């Protein structure tokens, strides 16, 4: 066959289970998997000493905050971390500054991803009350899915009440698209946040301000 890369002595993780054997790569794709040794020549041969060999993982929910808040994390540092953990594809969320809400903001973020990403990537788009007419363009440009919020997500990312959620769902359904929702009931979160406002902030207090009932109510409404 002749391969570009032959990986030997591997524990190969497959849908059917773990195979102790070898894997050949040709033109950037898996060409063959076999138990034991593959009898093929290769430009490069690696014996990985019985280590596990996984397919590249996909992170569907990173927040790289690039552009707008790169001090938190940008595409370069975020995808370096992804690659070190075995993630070869990232699907980045649209909560950037500005959010990905139309063709202009999509193009801006795409340039940042092209310049900084170490791994394969795709981009989510936003679904907000003021950009429903832009969803079709976003999909055409390459947005893989749309993200909406059922509660306040900051001044730059509009959240949607039940009426707006219905409008967004109908439009995305017409596009045969995918709609992902940050589902927490706005009133419950607001009231519980007010209830614990006088307590010193901690992870435990933050958790109490967003009880399971807030998520369950939002999901049931959706």
Name the predicted role of every residue range.
Residues 133-222:
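Histidine/acidic residue-rich metal-binding segments in metalloenzymes
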Residues 56-62, 90-92, 121-125, 146-148, ...:
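Hydrophobic faces of well-ordered beta-strands that scaffold small-molecule active sites
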Residues 60-73, 96, 120-131, 157, ...:
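Active-site mouth loops of central-metabolism enzymes
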Residues 103-119, 166-181:
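Alpha-helix-loop-beta-strand connector modules within alpha/beta enzyme cores
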Residues 51-116:
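Metal-associated gating/positioning segment near the N- to mid-region
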Residues 10, 23, 28, 50, ...:
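Divalent metal-coordination and catalytic microenvironments
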Residues 94-118, 124-129, 137, 150-155, ...:
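Active-site loop-to-helix "anion-binding N-cap" substructures in soluble metabolic enzymes
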Residues 1-6, 11-55:
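Histidine-rich, glycine-flanked metal-binding segment
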């Amino acid at each position: 066959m002749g391969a570009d890369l032959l990986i030997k002595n591997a524990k190969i993780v497959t849908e059917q289970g773990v195979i102790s054997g070898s894997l050949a790569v040709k033109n950037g794709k898996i060409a063959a998997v076999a138990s034991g040794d593959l009898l093929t020549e290769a430009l490069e041969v690696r014996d990985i000493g019985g280590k596990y060999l996984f397919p590249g993982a996909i992170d569907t929910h990173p927040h790289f905050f690039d552009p707008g808040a790169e001090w938190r994390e940008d595409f370069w540092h975020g995808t370096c971390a992804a690659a070190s953990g075995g993630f070869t594809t990232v699907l980045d969320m649209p909560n950037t500054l500005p959010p990905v809400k139309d063709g202009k903001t999509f193009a801006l973020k795409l340039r940042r991803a092209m310049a900084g990403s170490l791994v394969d990537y795709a981009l989510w788009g936003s679904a907000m009350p003021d950009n429903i007419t832009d969803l079709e363009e976003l999909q055409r440009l390459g947005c893989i899915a749309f993200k909406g919020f059922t509660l306040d997500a900051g001044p730059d990312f509009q959240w949607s009440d039940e009426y707006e959620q219905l409008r967004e769902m109908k439009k995305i359904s017409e596009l045969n698209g995918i709609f992902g929702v940050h589902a927490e009931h706005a009133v419950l979160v607001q009231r519980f946040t007010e209830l614990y406002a006088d307590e010193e902030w901690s992870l435990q207090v933050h958790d109490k301000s967003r009880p399971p009932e807030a998520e369950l109510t939002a999901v049931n409404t959706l």
